[in-house]
Amino acid sequence: MTKKIEEKIEGVIESLGYLLYDVSLVKENEQHVLRVSLKNPNGAVSLDICQQVSEIISPLLDVCDFIQDAYILEVSSMGLERTLKTPKHFKLSLGEKVEVKLINKESFQAVLKDANDLSADFELDNHAIKSVEYKDLKKVKTLFEW
């Protein structure tokens, strides 16, 4: 269902100058919550941007009726520290510092340098590039350094 929602709202969000990072539908305290997270290629995602996007996509979602039950729509920034789950997440996070945990228990911190549909390239502290297929990743999380 979230894939259909993503397909429906992605073009609208891009027409406003922002990028759709993720869509998730969760249940919290018996209430369905549709979370839409954004990236602003020109800077931060402000509260005004979230409100603008919410006001535009909310009626669109109501007309499409993808979610049968009542739900709360939350529009937010993708966040400074987040888990990268899809090739799209990796592509939208290029140049960021990440913590990588592999299935074989190896872990390291690096800068995400490149990503495609099968793998990601990480620049290690010694400037070497380590290429890892997504299937070998256990968890990758962006790191915010103060």
From Swiss-Prot:
<dbReference type="Pfam" id="PF17384">
    <property type="entry name" value="DUF150_C"/>
</dbReference>
<dbReference type="InterPro" id="IPR028989">
    <property type="entry name" value="RimP_N"/>
</dbReference>
<dbReference type="GO" id="GO:0005829">
    <property type="term" value="C:cytosol"/>
</dbReference>
<dbReference type="InterPro" id="IPR003728">
    <property type="entry name" value="Ribosome_maturation_RimP"/>
</dbReference>
<dbReference type="Pfam" id="PF02576">
    <property type="entry name" value="RimP_N"/>
</dbReference>
<dbReference type="GO" id="GO:0006412">
    <property type="term" value="P:translation"/>
</dbReference>
<keyword id="KW-0963">Cytoplasm</keyword>
<comment type="similarity">
    <text>Belongs to the RimP family.</text>
</comment>
<keyword id="KW-0690">Ribosome biogenesis</keyword>
<comment type="function">
    <text>Required for maturation of 30S ribosomal subunits.</text>
</comment>
<protein>
    <recommendedName>
        <fullName>Ribosome maturation factor RimP</fullName>
    </recommendedName>
</protein>
<dbReference type="GO" id="GO:0000028">
    <property type="term" value="P:ribosomal small subunit assembly"/>
</dbReference>
<dbReference type="InterPro" id="IPR035956">
    <property type="entry name" value="RimP_N_sf"/>
</dbReference>
<dbReference type="InterPro" id="IPR028998">
    <property type="entry name" value="RimP_C"/>
</dbReference>
